[in-house]
């Protein structure tokens, strides 16, 4: 057997024994471009036993076959360590995977590199799961046992399948304490959950809020509220369970918990529940699992006496089941996302109540059956676990033999080529330095944060740290809540002076949609912000105008800004009592006729001259006008004014009739609406009771 150094075209090199044109004996080989290194024994070009080191510092120590890891060996990948069997490059059939910085581990059977079959999963806080696995997830039947509540770890991740995430192979096998897992959409669960505790006395974030009239309708909201009074999520049940020292805010470490919902504001009810629960309370779940979550039939029981038997969905009570309280009382019915929505209490129809009770009994029987199967599967998993431990011990011996072969190969490579670069030890040094730096950073960051800010120590990946404790940036703009509200900009042409608005001319408060009117053009314009029906309603509320007016006074008030009579005073008739004319400039309800428009332009008063007309008391001033033009003008304008007055009188009569109709219709419409609402409520209640 000869030996030496051989350089390949891809940048790799081999230094060691050689026979028949192939690596044989002991030797050291680097991969393409010098990346990666294998040192150990060879058999005509294939690895037999040795150590492979990746550029990241990950290593495999064990046996090989046909160029793949096969047999027994130990893989160090990030902060995870696998010890056990290998089959054609994949983990399995039996093996153990554990975390180097926590107590999290899996012991059992494997298939294609994933947990598959039966095994035991132990979490960082000491909780365990024994049962079936499929494709790296808890699937089938199993038993989940938690540690005492005071020792259970707080789950801060918004999305996580397991406490230490024994599923992921990404990022060199290292999974951050709060790293997300791709398990599908999440359901809002109680805030601050604890590992292994899924019997929640709190409803979901949406159901925990008091149902309003406008969320799901007035009728459905009230009916839902009355039906769920016996639920563990109701307010009355919360108070009773607080007295019995039970708690919520808990879910399984494999469940998904959201801190964004229910963790802020005065409605955060997780703190009192966490404070009142007994620290020695434990919880056990026995039943079905689907896709790493409690789904199907199962039994969950706490050491304090709280027990649920029935159907589950995504770690929540969902379906028909029965909850037994610590004091012996029971509630049973249909659950929907942890809330009892259809119970057997206070039922109107006994037939429907019996159907619900039958479904509850079926759910309880299925849960007890599933619990018995889960206990059997847990016993099988325990036997598989003991076998996996034996394989792990054998893998440790295989790793020792592989290291011996690696040392022989390194010694031979130095003898054959002293200048040959061996990258393996350098990779491992880099990995050790990186781990030391990460550990020092994780130790320094909580010290800097804790004394300075008084905040509890949390992982830096924790979303709760960002959601609830991140202060506002100091250099940013001030909060919008602190700035005074900007004044509303007036509309074009508006004026703050009340005398320039249409309502001010008429002695009324101006409306929101009205536009200001100037003496020249405001009398004949309509406000674009109001429809014609609105103007009719507003006109109807005005005081009734006088039956007739004095044309001369109305005519000459437009010229002199006060009432003037040119002819000799005559005793006015009874229907011509002098009254102020608030309605003269307001004609915005209808488009004016050409004659009335000319009269209104002449009659529009000057600004700020609001002297009421007193024709009965004023004495006429001596005016010397030209006789013939005045008479002609007076005759023409009086004729036009009489026509306009007739039209105005007709319009005002129509407005008064509309007002009377509105007043007559208002009372019956209100009573009719109330009667319809009451009738709908009665029909809805009867319909719901008949359906359920």
From Swiss-Prot:
UniProt KW keywords: Cell membrane, Developmental protein, DNA-binding, Endoplasmic reticulum, Membrane, Nucleus, Phosphoprotein, Repeat, Repressor, Sarcoplasmic reticulum, Transcription, Transcription regulation, Transmembrane, Transmembrane helix
InterPro entries: Junctophilin (IPR017191), MORN (IPR003409)
An example molecular function term from Gene Ontology annotations: phosphatidylinositol-3-phosphate binding
Modified residues (Phosphoserine): 162, 165, 440, 442, 462, 479, 527, 533, 589, 593, 604, 609
Transmembrane segments: 671-691
Description of post-translational modifications: Proteolytically cleaved by calpain in response to cardiac stress. The major cleavage site takes place at the C-terminus and leads to the release of the Junctophilin-2 N-terminal fragment chain (JP2NT). Phosphorylation on Ser-165, probably by PKC, affects RYR1-mediated calcium ion release, interaction with TRPC3, and skeletal muscle myotubule development.
Family statement drawn from the similarity comment of this UniProt entry: Belongs to the junctophilin family.
Official protein name in the record: Junctophilin-2
Lineage of producing organism: Eukaryota, Metazoa, Chordata, Craniata, Vertebrata
């Amino acid at each position: 057997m000869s030996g030496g150094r051989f350089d390949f075209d891809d940048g790799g090199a081999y230094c060691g024994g050689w026979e028949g044109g192939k690596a044989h004996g002991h030797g050291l080989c680097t991969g393409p471009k010098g990346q990666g290194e294998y040192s150990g024994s060879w058999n005509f070009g294939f690895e037999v036993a040795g150590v492979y080191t990746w550029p990241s510092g990950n290593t495999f120590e064990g046996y090989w076959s046909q160029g793949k890891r096969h047999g027994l060996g130990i893989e160090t990948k990030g902060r995870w360590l696998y010890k056990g069997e290998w089959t054609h490059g994949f983990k399995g059939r039996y093996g153990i995977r554990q975390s180097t910085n926590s107590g999290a581990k899996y012991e059992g059977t494997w298939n294609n590199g994933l947990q598959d079959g039966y095994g035991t999963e132990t979490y960082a806080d000491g909780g365990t799961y024994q049962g079936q696995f499929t494709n790296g997830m808890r699937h089938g039947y199993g038993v989940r046992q938690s540690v005492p509540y005071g020792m259970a770890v707080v789950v801060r991740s918004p999305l996580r399948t397991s406490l230490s995430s024994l599923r992921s192979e990404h990022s060199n096998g290292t999974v951050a304490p709060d790293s997300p897992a791709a398990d599908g959409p999440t359901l809002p669960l109680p805030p601050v959950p604890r590992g292994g505790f899924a019997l929640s006395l709190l409803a979901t974030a949406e159901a925990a809020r008091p149902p309003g009239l406008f969320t799901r309708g007035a009728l459905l909201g009230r009916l839902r509220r009355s039906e769920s009074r016996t639920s563990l999520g109701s307010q009355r049940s919360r108070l009773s369970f607080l007295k019995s020292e039970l708690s919520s805010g808990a879910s399984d470490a494999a469940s998904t918990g959201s801190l964004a919902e229910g963790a802020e504001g005065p409605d955060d009810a997780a703190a009192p529940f966490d404070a009142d629960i007994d620290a020695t309370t434990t919880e056990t779940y026995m039943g079905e699992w689907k896709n790493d979550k409690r789904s199907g039939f199962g039994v969950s029981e706490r050491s304090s006496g709280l027990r649920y038997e029935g159907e589950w969905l995504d770690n929540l009570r969902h379906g028909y089941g029965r909850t037994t309280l610590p004091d012996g009382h029971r509630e049973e019915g249909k659950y929907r996302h942890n809330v009892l929505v259809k119970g057997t209490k206070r039922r109107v129809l006994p037939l429907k109540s019996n159907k619900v009770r039958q479904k509850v009994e079926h759910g309880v029987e299925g849960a007890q059956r599933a619990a018995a199967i889960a206990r059997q599967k847990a016993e099988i998993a325990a036997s598989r676990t003991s076998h996996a431990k034996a394989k792990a011990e054998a893998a440790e011996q295989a790793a020792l033999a592989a290291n011996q072969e690696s040392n022989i190969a390194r010694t031979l490579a130095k003898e054959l080529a002293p200048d040959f670069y061996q990258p393996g030890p350098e990779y491992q040094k880099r990995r050790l330095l990186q781990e030391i730096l990460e550990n020092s950073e994780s130790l320094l960051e909580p010290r800097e944060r804790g004394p300075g800010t008084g905040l509890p120590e949390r992982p830096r990946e924790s979303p709760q740290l960002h959601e609830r404790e991140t202060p506002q940036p100091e250099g940013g703009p001030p909060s919008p809540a602190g700035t005074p509200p900007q004044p509303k900009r007036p509309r074009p042409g508006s004026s703050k002076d009340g005398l320039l608005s249409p309502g001010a001319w008429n002695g009324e408060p101006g409306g929101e949609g009205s536009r200001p009117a100037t003496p020249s053009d405001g009398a004949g314009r309509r406000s674009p912000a109001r429809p014609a029906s609105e103007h009719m309603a507003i006109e109807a509320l005005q005081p009734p105008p006088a039956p007739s007016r004095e044309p001369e006074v109305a005519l000459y008030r437009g010229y002199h800004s006060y009432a003037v009579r040119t002819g000799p005073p005559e005793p006015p008739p009874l229907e011509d009592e002098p009254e102020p004319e608030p309605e003269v400039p307001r004609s915005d309800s209808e488009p004016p006729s050409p004659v009335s428009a000319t009269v209104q332009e002449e009659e529009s008063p000057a600004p700020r001259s609001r002297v009421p007309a007193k024709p009965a008391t004023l004495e006429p001033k001596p005016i010397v006008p030209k006789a013939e033009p005045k008479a002609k003008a007076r005759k023409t304008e009086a004729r036009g004014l009489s026509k306009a007055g007739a039209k105005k009188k007709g319009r005002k009569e129509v407005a008064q009739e509309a007002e009377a109709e509105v007043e007559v219709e208002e009372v019956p419409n209100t009573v009719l609406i109330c009667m319809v609402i009451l009738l709908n409520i009665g029909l809805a209640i009867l319909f719901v009771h008949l359906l359920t």
